[in-house]
């Protein structure tokens, strides 16, 4: 999913629910770096995390011991995004990615992603990965626009 997202012209929003886990293998850490995320997810130790990357570069990243909420805009204000992360240390694990008033994050344990197509300037997919286990189980990919197909 993320490997394919890396091959296109996408903006990726990430929010952590609970813990990213220290089981994140090198190949996945490397892929996240290639996508533009600068934070080493293994070192979060249950902290909250919000990140936005576009074109292989970090646009916004924030970590904290408290629940985080950020209101950001994409595409020159065309899309309003509210991102919430509750790491394990907050006692309130949650991941929310709301674009123009609609919830897109699967709110699964681990790292939640929402992918926006930069050409269409619309959300195209969302998925969460439970990185606290080696199988990296994911909640099914939600694709929002049929003309854009991101498959595993």
Which residues fall in each region the model found?
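Short acidic-hydrophobic catalytic motif
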Residues: 1-152
């Amino acid at each position: 999913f993320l490997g394919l997202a890396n091959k296109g012209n996408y903006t990726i929003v990430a929010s952590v629910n609970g813990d990213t886990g220290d089981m994140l293998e090198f190949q996945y850490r490397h892929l996240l770096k290639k996508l533009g995320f600068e934070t080493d997810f293994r070192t979060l130790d249950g902290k909250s995390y919000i990140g936005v990357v576009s074109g292989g570069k970090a646009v916004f990243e924030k970590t904290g011991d408290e629940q985080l909420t950020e209101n950001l805009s994409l595409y020159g204000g065309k899309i309003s995004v509210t991102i919430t992360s509750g790491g394990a240390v907050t006692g309130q694990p949650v991941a929310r990615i709301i674009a123009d008033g609609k919830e897109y994050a699967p709110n699964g344990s681990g790292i939640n992603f929402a992918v926006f197509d930069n050409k269409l300037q619309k959300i195209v997919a969302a998925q969460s990965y439970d990185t606290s286990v080696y199988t990296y189980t994911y909640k099914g990919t939600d694709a929002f626009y049929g003309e854009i197909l991101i498959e595993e």
